[in-house]
């Protein structure tokens, strides 16, 4: 009978075919879809400092400036000149109770000039008149025989001493002010002065990425669990195929093992 071109004829052989043992292998591998040619990397952010290019000038107005020694002394003079008020008021009180008005009016007049001027000669003269008034008053009170007048004289002597100490500080400040040169700092405008400040470049922090490789541990790798093969082993046997001219052609064709259930 004839054989078609697309039909296969199995030829049994006398040699027994040994069944190949089934082997199972466990494969460990790392995913290469994300990092096919290099290790995985972690991108960290590290701050870097850059300088701003802004150099705009700004003007600041300060109150009660202290730009040099002269400014400091002038501020002290403004407050210490009130130390002349106490002696001047005491001289006015003595003037009202005195019988020689013209003589006792000289000291209060010097006190007015000492309060509104910074002339050291006038201030020193008024200080001497105030010291004379205080000493004269204490001596007059001590001359009494009563205890009240003696206690009053002690109290007045303490007050007069404190007043003269404050007055002497005012005179010392005027002497220091006279020996200090002129202020060559910023221009004074009223109670404050303008200071021109040239702004310096401001540092700005910009995060920069840092690439750091990440280590891979065995516990992080995917694992393929071996599964038992459910397919039976295949047997490869030679097969003869005839072409159109009826020439035999041998092929190796796998067939199922009929002995396995």
UniProtKB/Swiss-Prot annotation:
Q: What is this protein called?
A: Uncharacterized transmembrane protein DDB_G0286729
The portions of this protein that span the membrane are 92-112, 122-142, 147-167
Q: Tell me the lineage of the source organism.
A: Eukaryota, Amoebozoa, Evosea, Eumycetozoa, Dictyostelia
| Coiled-coil residue windows | none
GO cellular-component terms in the record? Answer: membrane
The record's subcellular location field reads: Membrane
Q: Where is this region: Disordered?
A: 1-22
How this chain sits in the membrane, per its record, is: Multi-pass membrane protein
The organism's superkingdom is given as: Eukaryota
> Would the keyword Cytoplasm be found if you checked this record's keyword annotation?
no
**Swiss-Prot/TrEMBL keywords:** Membrane, Transmembrane, Transmembrane helix
């Amino acid at each position: 009978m004839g054989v078609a071109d697309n039909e296969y004829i199995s030829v049994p052989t006398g040699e027994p075919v040994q069944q190949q043992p089934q082997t199972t292998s466990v494969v460990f591998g790392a995913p290469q879809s994300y990092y096919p040619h290099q290790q995985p990397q972690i991108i960290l952010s590290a701050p870097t400092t850059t300088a701003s290019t802004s150099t705009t000038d700004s003007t600041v107005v300060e109150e009660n400036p202290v730009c040099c020694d002269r400014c400091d002394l002038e501020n002290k003079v403004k407050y210490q000149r009130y130390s002349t008020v106490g002696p001047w008021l005491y001289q006015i009180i003595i003037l009202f109770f005195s019988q020689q008005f013209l003589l006792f009016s000289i000291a209060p007049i010097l006190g007015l000039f000492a309060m509104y001027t910074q002339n050291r000669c006038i201030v020193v003269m008024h200080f001497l008149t105030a010291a004379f008034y205080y000493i004269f008053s204490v001596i007059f009170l001590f001359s009494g025989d009563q205890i009240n007048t003696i206690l009053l004289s002690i109290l007045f002597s303490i007050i007069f001493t404190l007043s003269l100490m404050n007055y002497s500080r005012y005179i010392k400040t005027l002497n220091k002010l006279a020996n200090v040169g002129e202020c060559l700092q910023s221009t004074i405008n009223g109670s404050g002065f303008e200071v021109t400040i040239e702004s310096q470049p401001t540092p700005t922090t910009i995060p920069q990425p840092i690439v750091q490789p990440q280590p891979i541990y065995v516990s992080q790798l995917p694992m393929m669990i071996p599964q038992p093969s459910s397919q039976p082993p295949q047997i490869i046997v030679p097969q003869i195929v005839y072409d159109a001219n009826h020439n035999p052609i041998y092929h190796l064709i796998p067939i199922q093992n009929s002995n396995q259930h």
